C-alpha cells in the first residue's frame, strides 16, 4: 500500500504512469529484482533509492510487530513419508538382488540407489510444502522457508522431511541415506553419516572462502587496466546470438533467451522482408528484444568485447549498457574491475551454502517422454538397437528420428523420438498413462569426470570370463586386460594350498584329499630314508599326520578283492616306481607282493583287468622304472615323490599286451586304431595295520579323450568298500553291467550306497585352467564349495525288457556320471516310441542304441562294439523327452555350464546360488559355487584366465563418467580450471580438432593459404564463446546470473597474446616470445617481413604475469624475478593501468566525472543510417588490415557471394 500511495503522489508531477503495473502479491527475491529494474527504468536512480528505503523501513517494522518464533510443535512431518520411504527401500532391495545375480555392477547399483533416494527426498519436500499450505499456511516454519531470507526449503526439509543423502569428506555421495529428520532424531549410524556432511560444510566454508577470495584477486588482476576510453572503435565484427533456444525441460516447450540480448549493441542492421527494424550500433532494450524474439528466427549479429579494436581498453558500443541503469556505459568506467568482482563475488558468498544432496542427480540431465494415455505402443524394431541405460536397465537406442504410435482404446497418437534417445519400452507393449517411454539426451552435456571404480572379489577361487577380452595397450606384457564387450566374469569357488607345505604325492586334477588338516598340520618327512625291517616299512623322520589314511603305514599290499577293477603289477624286483607325467598321463607308483589273499599269483610285467563296460585304448598307461636311483622296498604313499629323480634315459617302458583278460581268462582282442577312451577303472589298495581296523584306499582313474586331448583324473578316498556297487551278471557275453554312483554332500564324488567314508572332510583337487604347471600350489574344492541339487525326484522310466530284468532294480536305467564324461550303457531301456532327442519326441519305429557316450565338449556319440563306429547323436544342448507315462522333461544342462542364481532347473525350488555344473547324474547335479560379476565395455580385468584369486583381491576396474556436482562449492575448482586454461580442460582439447575441421572446409573454398588463415581465426573465436558458456554453466546451476559481457572481458584478456614462432623472426621478435595480438598485427603491417605467430589461450595467472606493466606484474607474483628481468631488459612502465598508479600514489586513469557533449553522430557515422562502407571494412578486417592483397579467382567468387545478401538488403 505504501508503494501505491507513493505512485499516486508522483502522479501529480505529470509523469507517464499509464504503463506502470500494479503489484499486489507476495514477492520473493526474484520478483523484487524485477520490480527494482522497472523502477529504475521509469524513475531513475534517485527516486528508486527513496522507494527502496521505504520498503526496508516497512519490512523491519512488520517483522518486529509480528515477532515470528519457532517451536517444536511447528515442525510437522508429512503423513506420506512412511510409504514413500517403504517404497524406496523396496526398490533398493530389488537393485541389491540384481547386483547379487550379476545383472548390475557396483556403479549402476550406486546410481540407482542415489537416484531412488534423491527422488524420494525431493518428492517428500514437495509433499511438505503442500501439507503446510493445506493444513497450516501461517506456520512459522512454512513462512520462513519461502521468505527468501537465510533459511530455505532445503534446510526446512531436513527438519520436518528427511535428512537425505550426505557427502563424505571427498565430496562423494554416500549411498546410505538418512531416513529420519532432525525432529524425529537420528540413529547412531545416521548421526555419524550426518556428521560427515556437517563437517564438510564447516571445512568448505573455511577453505573455499579463501579459494574464492584468491580467485577474485586473480580475476581483478588480469583485467584491472580495462577502462572505457572511447565511444566506438569502428569494428565490423561481432558474434551471432540466437534469441530462441530449443527444447530444454519439455520437447514442446521453447525457452526464450531474451536476457542475453538486453543491453547489447547491434553489429549489423536487422531486416525483415526488406524492412529495417533495427540499425547498426543501436542498443537493445526490452521492447526490441521481445520484437526480435517474435519475428526474427535467425541469429542476430551483436557487438562483443571479443572484437573490440581498442588496445588494452574498450569502447562503449562493444560493451553495451551498464548493468546498473538502462543507458550505455559511461566513459571512464573501470569495467575490468567490475567484471572481476562480478565473477568472484558469487563464489565468495555462495561458499556459505551447504548442499548435501548434490543437485547433479536431478532430472535436468535428460528429458522424459511420457505416454499421453493407456494403449499399445508400436514402432519399427529395425531402426533401434539394444543397449543399457546408465542405471543398467535394458533399453533401445535410436540413431535417427523414430516414429512411434500409441494405439489407445478410442484414440491414436503419433510421437517422434529425437535421435540418440533411449526407448525404455518394447514393441507391442501395453503402456499406462504418464508412463516414461523414452529418455531424450540433453542438448548441453553437464560437467563430467572419468572415475575408476575397483570391484573386489567376494570369495576365493578361480577366475573365468565369458566375454571377449584383450591386453590393455599400456599393459601388453602384464596381467591387465580390457573388456571388448559387456559380459560376465566368474569366480569359481575353491581354496589354494601350497604343495611345499603339504606332502601329497597325487596333487593332480580331480584328486580327492582331506582338506581339514591343511590349515593346522605340517610335516618334515624324509622320502629317501626308508629301510626294510622284519617285514615292516616305516618312514623315519619328523612326521605329523596329514591325511586321514596316513595312520595305516605298515605292510601295505596290493589287493584286488572285487571284480571288474584294474590293477597293475610289476616284476618282483622290488623296484620303487616314480610318478612321471608323460603324454598327459599320470602314472601311479606301486609295489607288489607275490601273495594275493591265500594264493600265490605270478607277476608278469603288466596285467590289466578291466570291467566289461569300460573301454581301454592300447598303450594308454605306461610304467616307468629308475634303476639308478631306486629306493628300497617300502610303501611311500604318504610322502611326495621327487620327480627330479626320474630321467628320460633311465626310464624302462613296460609294454601292455594287446589283449584284455576277463574274469574267467577269456581272451578278447582289442580293436586297433581306434579313439576309444578309458572311461573309469579302479586301483585298489588293501592297507593292513597291526593294531588298527582294516581299511582300504582306492585310487580311481578317469581318462577322457576329446579332440585328441586326453584328460586324466585321479580320485583317492579312504573307504571300507570299493567306491562302486557292482551288479550281478546273468550272462557272461552280455554287456549290460552298469556302474552306480550317487553323490552325497560329505563326499561329492563317491558312492553313498555300500561305501562309507571314514574321513568327513574330503576335497577334490582342481587343476589350474591357465595351462601352467605350478608345482608349488594347487586348488582344492572342499564340500562347502559344491552343492547338490535334485532335478526330478518322481521321474519314472519304464522298461520293456523281460520279467527278470524288471525284478532287478539295478537293471533299470542307471547312468554313470563321471566328472568330465559320461558312459551310458542302455539295453532296451526305452520303448520304441521314445528316445533321447533334442527337445522333442521323434517318430516311432526308431532303432534303439545300446551305448552312447557324452564327452567333455557336451557331444553325445554312439558306439557300436561290432562295427566300431562313433556317430554324433545329439547337439551340445540336450534333454530327454518322456513318453506318455513321464510327463516331465529334463532341463537342458551340460557339463561346465555356468548357471546364475534363482534359475529354475528343478521342480522344487530355484537354484540357491550361482555355480558351475561339474557332475551330472540322472536325477541330480553337482554344482561348484561361483559368483558372477558384470563387466561393461572398456573395463579393466586384473589377472589371467584361470588365475587363482584370494578374497578381497582387485578383480575389475570399471571406468565410467560421473557428473560433477553442480554445487558452487564443488564448482569453484571447475571455474578455476577453466580460468587457468589447464591442459585437461575441454577447451584446450577441442582447439586442435576444431581447427582441423575448419581447415578442411575452408581449403576447398578459398585455397590452402586463406583456408588456414581464416580457420585459425574462426577456431579461436569459437573457443572463446565455448569458454564463456562453460563458466556460465557452473554459476547458472545454482541460480546465479552473471552478465556474459563480464566473462567476455576476462576471456578477451586470456586470448590477447600470441606466441612468436621461429620462422623469419630473427630481426623482429625473439622466438617463443609472448606479445599482444594487436601489436603483432601492427608490426606485420609496418614491416615488409612477415611475422609468424600462433594464438594462445593463457590462464589468468600467466596472463597477469605477461602485461605491459612490470610494476603490476611484480606486485602480483614472483616479485624478485619480474623486477630483475625488467631491469635487465630495460623495460619502461607507462603507468596506463589502475594498479600501478595506485602503487605509486598517482591519479588513476578512470572516472566518470568529465562532461562530454553527446551528438547524434559518433566518428562521423550516423547510428540511424549506418556505415556506407561496411562491406569494405569487413573485407579489410577479415584480412587483418593487410594492404598488399592479391585476389585469385576463388577469392573473388567468395567475396561476390558475400556481397549478395548485402545488396538485397
UniProtKB/Swiss-Prot annotation:
Instruction: For this entry, list what GO says about its biological process.
Output: DNA-templated transcription
Annotated Zn(2+) binding lies at 233, 308, 315, 318
Enzyme's top EC category: transferase
Q: Where in the cell is it found?
A: Plastid, Chloroplast
Q: Please name the InterPro entries in this protein's record.
A: DNA-dir_RpoC2_beta_pp, RNA_pol_beta''_euk, RNA_pol_Rpb1_3_sf, RNA_pol_Rpb1_4, RNA_pol_Rpb1_5, Rpb1_funnel_sf
Cofactor(s) listed in the protein's UniProt record: Zn(2+)
- Alphabetical UniProt keywords: Chloroplast, DNA-directed RNA polymerase, Metal-binding, Nucleotidyltransferase, Plastid, Transcription, Transferase, Zinc
Protein role: DNA-dependent RNA polymerase catalyzes the transcription of DNA into RNA using the four ribonucleoside triphosphates as substrates.
Under the subunit heading, UniProt states: In plastids the minimal PEP RNA polymerase catalytic core is composed of four subunits: alpha, beta, beta', and beta''. When a (nuclear-encoded) sigma factor is associated with the core the holoenzyme is formed, which can initiate transcription.
Q: What is this protein called?
A: DNA-directed RNA polymerase subunit beta''
Gene source species: Pinus koraiensis
